[in-house]
């Protein structure tokens, strides 16, 4: 009976309402953490996984040896590779495709690659107007790698002590 009377007076005096308003008032004047994204950028982790790229050796030869480990380890089945044996007995890729609509950006392909051929860059701003625009071919991936090689090499060097 005493508890019922206490609850009645608490609800009559709107105690719960004022507790909620006090909580709201505390956060009303606090520092805002919202970032206006296109204009403002937040700091990016050095291990951020963005757009994929295929790398080349300094002599211009592509690094991928067509071992297909990245294709095998991809949980989303986003990578498809076809290879061919060259005259000197080494294998090279003839087709290397990544479907970014399937990719979950887990980084397993990058970890599995024995020659650091496939990497995930820090590029996060890319788009496609059609589904096919997010289907990256070998030439497109090599172009991304060629364009951003200095940044990729710097990120690899900075991360080398943790590998």
From Swiss-Prot:
It is an enzyme of class 7 (translocase). It is a peripheral membrane protein. Pfam families: Fer4_7. Its EC number is 7.1.1.-. Keywords: 4Fe-4S, Cell inner membrane, Cell membrane, Iron, Iron-sulfur, Membrane, Metal-binding, NAD, Quinone, Repeat, Translocase, Ubiquinone. The keyword Hydrolase does not apply. InterPro entries: 4Fe4S_Fe-S-bd, 4Fe4S_Fe_S_CS, NADH_quinone_OxRdtase_chainI. GO terms for molecular function: 4 iron, 4 sulfur cluster binding; iron ion binding; NADH:ubiquinone reductase (non-electrogenic) activity; quinone binding. Binds 2 [4Fe-4S] clusters per subunit. The keyword Repeat applies. Its cofactor is [4Fe-4S] cluster. GO terms for cellular component: plasma membrane. It is found in: Cell inner membrane. [4Fe-4S] cluster 2 binds at residues 74, 103, 106, 109. Residues 54-84, 94-123 form the 4Fe-4S ferredoxin-type domain. [4Fe-4S] cluster 1 binds at residues 64, 67, 70, 113. GO terms for biological process: aerobic respiration. Gene3D superfamilies: 3.30.70.3270. It catalyses: a quinone + NADH + 5 H(+)(in) = a quinol + NAD(+) + 4 H(+)(out). NDH-1 shuttles electrons from NADH, via FMN and iron-sulfur (Fe-S) centers, to quinones in the respiratory chain. The immediate electron acceptor for the enzyme in this species is believed to be ubiquinone. Couples the redox reaction to proton translocation (for every two electrons transferred, four hydrogen ions are translocated across the cytoplasmic membrane), and thus conserves the redox energy in a proton gradient. NDH-1 is composed of 14 different subunits. Subunits NuoA, H, J, K, L, M, N constitute the membrane sector of the complex. PANTHER family: NADH DEHYDROGENASE [UBIQUINONE] IRON-SULFUR PROTEIN 8, MITOCHONDRIAL, NADH DEHYDROGENASE UBIQUINONE IRON-SULFUR PROTEIN 8, MITOCHONDRIAL. Belongs to the complex I 23 kDa subunit family. This is NADH-quinone oxidoreductase subunit I. It comes from Cupriavidus metallidurans (strain ATCC 43123 / DSM 2839 / NBRC 102507 / CH34) (Ralstonia metallidurans). The gene is nuoI.
